[in-house]
C-alpha cells in the first residue's frame, strides 16, 4: 500500500484512475485481510493457539478498536436500510460502499493487533512520495511523461479541456493533497523524533511534498498541514510546563490569526478573503470552490434519514446539487453532478447517519487522547498520530477516497498498535 499501490498509475490515464486504483485497493487490502486471517487459522490448526471466541476478541479490544467495529456495524445497518442497497454495498462513483469500508476497518483493526511498525516502512513511503512528487513537478512544468493526461493536454488544461485537476499517480489534486497531509507530518516528526543521522534523509521527501503542496496550493491541504503542525509541536514536548506553554502559544497564534483574517483578510484575496467574509457574517455559495453550496445542499438532506443516512456512497442519488460551466471551446454548457459532500464528516453523517459519525469521531478522539499522552516518549505514536491529525484536519474540506483514505486507516492502526504496546511493555523504540 505504501509503494506499489501508491505508485500504480492505472492503465487508462486519469480518465479511469479512480476505478483502477479501487481495484488495486481491493487486491492489496483484501489480500492482506485474507492472508492475515489464513495465517491465524493455520496457527490455530498447528497448535499455536486456539482461535478466540468472538466474546474473547471483543474483550481484548481497546476502546478505539471497539468504536471502529461499531462504526462498521452501523455502516452495515445503513447499507441494509439504504435507498439503493447495490450502490451502498459496491459503491457509487466514489467507490466507497460497504465493501470498501469493510476493508478500511478490517485492515485498521488487524494492523492495530498484529502490525509491527518498522523504520523501513517509513523509508519506503518516503521513496514512493518522492517519486510521486518528481512526477508532479514534471507535470507542473507542462510535461505529460506517463501519458496520464489526454493526448495533447497537460496539467494547465484543467477545467478548460477536461474537468478537474490531476497530479502524480494519485490523480485528483484534492485527493493528492490528502495524501500529502498525512505524509508531511509523518516525515517532519520522524526527522525530529527518530534517533540516528539517517533520519535526516527524510528531509528529502519532506521538502518535495511541501513544495508540491505549496505549488498546487490546495487550500484544504495547506490548512491541514499548518493545523497539524500547530497542534503537534506542544504534544511532542516532554516537560509539562513546556507543553502547557506550547498549547498557550498555539491558542494565541490561532486567536491572532483569526483576528488578522477578520481585519485584513478582505485585502488578501483567495481563501483568506472568503474566510474574512464568513467571519463578517457574509455567506456566498461560491466560497471554497463551491463547498458552501455543497454543504448547504447536503445539510438539507440530513433530517430525512438522520439515524442511518441514505447508505454509503449514495449522496449522488439523493441530491440535485450540480455545477454548471460554459465551455467556450466546445460551445456547450457542461453540468457536473455532486456525489460527495466535500467534507468527510458531513459525508458520513448524510450517508451513514448520526450514530456512525459519532462512533467514527469517538474512535479518532480516543486514539488522539492516547497519542497526546504517549507522543513525547514514543516516536511511533508521535509519527502516526501526526499523520492522522494532518489527514483529519484536511478532511473538513476533503473527499474520502480509496486512493487516499488508506493513509488514514494504516496510520490509525499503527497508532493504536504503538499505544497498546507502550501500555503493556513500556516505552520502546521501533
Where are these regions (language model features)?
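N-terminal hydrophobic segments of proteins, predominantly signal-anchor/transmembrane helices
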Residues: 1-14, 32-102, 261
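Alpha-helical transmembrane segments of multi-pass inner-membrane proteins
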Residues: 4, 27-40, 69-80, 98-110, ...
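Helix-to-loop transition at the C-terminal end of transmembrane segments
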Residues: 11-15, 137-149, 262-273, 307
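Alpha-helical transmembrane segments and their immediate interhelical/interface regions
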Residues: 13-26, 83-112, 266-287
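Membrane-interface catalytic loops of GT-C/OST-like multi-pass glycosylation enzymes that act
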Residues: 15-19, 89-93, 170-174, 216-224, ...
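Membrane-interface capping segments at transmembrane-helix boundaries
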Residues: 41-46, 418-427
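Interfacial juxtamembrane loops and adjacent helix segments
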Residues: 144-167, 271-289, 301, 312-350
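A conserved mid-to-late transmembrane alpha helix and its immediate loop/hinge
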Residues: 172, 210, 299, 305-307, ...
Amino acid at each position: 500500500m505504501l509503494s506499489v499501490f501508491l505508485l500504480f498509475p492505472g492503465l487508462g490515464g486519469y480518465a479511469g484512475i479512480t476505478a483502477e486504483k479501487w481495484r488495486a485497493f481491493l487486491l492489496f487490502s483484501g489480500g492482506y485481510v485474507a492472508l492475515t486471517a489464513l495465517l491465524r487459522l493455520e496457527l490455530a490448526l498447528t497448535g499455536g493457539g486456539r482461535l478466540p471466541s468472538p466474546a474473547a476478541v471483543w474483550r481484548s479490544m481497546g476502546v478505539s478498536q471497539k468504536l471502529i467495529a461499531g462504526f462498521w456495524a452501523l455502516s452495515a445497518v445503513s447499507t441494509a436500510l439504504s435507498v439503493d442497497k447495490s450502490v451502498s454495498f459496491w459503491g457509487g462513483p466514489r467507490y466507497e460502499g460497504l465493501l470498501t469500508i469493510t476493508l478500511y476497518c478490517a485492515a485498521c483493526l488487524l494492523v492495530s493487533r498484529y502490525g509491527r511498525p518498522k523504520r523501513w516502512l517509513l523509508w519506503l513511503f518516503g521513496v514512493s512520495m518522492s517519486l510521486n512528487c518528481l512526477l508532479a513537478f514534471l507535470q507542473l512544468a507542462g510535461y505529460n511523461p506517463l501519458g496520464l493526461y489526454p493526448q495533447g493536454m497537460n496539467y494547465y488544461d484543467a477545467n478548460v479541456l477536461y474537468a478537474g485537476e490531476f497530479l502524480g499517480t494519485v490523480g485528483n489534486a484534492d485527493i493528492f493533497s490528502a495524501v500529502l497531509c498525512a505524509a508531511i507530518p509523518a516525515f517532519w516528526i520522524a526527522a525530529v523524533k527518530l534517533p540516528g543521522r539517517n533520519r535526516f534523509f527524510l528531509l528529502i521527501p519532506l521538502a518535495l511534498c511541501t513544495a508540491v503542496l505549496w505549488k498546487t496550493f490546495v487550500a484544504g491541504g495547506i490548512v491541514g498541514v499548518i493545523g497539524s503542525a500547530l497542534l503537534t509541536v506542544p504534544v511532542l514536548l516532554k516537560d509539562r510546563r513546556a507543553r502547557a506553554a506550547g498549547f498557550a502559544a498555539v491558542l494565541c497564534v490561532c486567536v491572532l490569526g483569526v483576528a488578522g483574517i477578520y481585519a485584513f483578510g478582505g485585502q488578501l484575496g483567495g481563501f483568506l478573503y472568503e474566510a474574512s467574509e464568513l467571519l463578517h457574517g457574509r455567506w456566498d455559495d461560491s466560497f471554497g470552490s463551491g463547498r458552501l453550496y455543497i454543504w448547504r445542499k447536503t445539510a438539507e438532506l440530513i433530517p430525512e434519514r438522520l439515524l442511518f443516512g441514505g447508505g454509503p456512497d449514495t449522496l449522488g442519488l439523493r441530491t440535485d446539487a450540480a455545477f454548471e460551466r460554459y465551455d467556450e471551446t466546445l460551445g456547450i454548457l457542461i453540468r457536473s453532478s455532486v456525489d460527495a459532500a466535500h467534507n468527510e464528516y458531513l459525508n458520513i453523517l448524510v450517508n451513514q447517519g448520526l450514530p456512525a459519525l459519532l462512533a467514527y469521531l469517538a474512535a479518532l478522539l480516543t486514539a488522539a487522547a492516547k497519542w497526546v499522552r504517549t507522543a513525547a516518549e514514543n516516536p511511533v505514536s508521535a509519527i502516526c498520530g501526526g499523520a492522522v491529525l494532518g489527514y483529519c484536519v484536511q478532511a473538513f474540506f476533503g473527499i474520502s477516497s480509496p486512493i487516499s483514505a488508506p493513509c488514514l486507516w494504516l496510520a490509525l492502526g499503527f497508532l493504536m498498535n504503538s499505544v497498546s504496546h507502550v501500555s503493556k511493555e513500556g516505552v520502546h523504540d521501533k
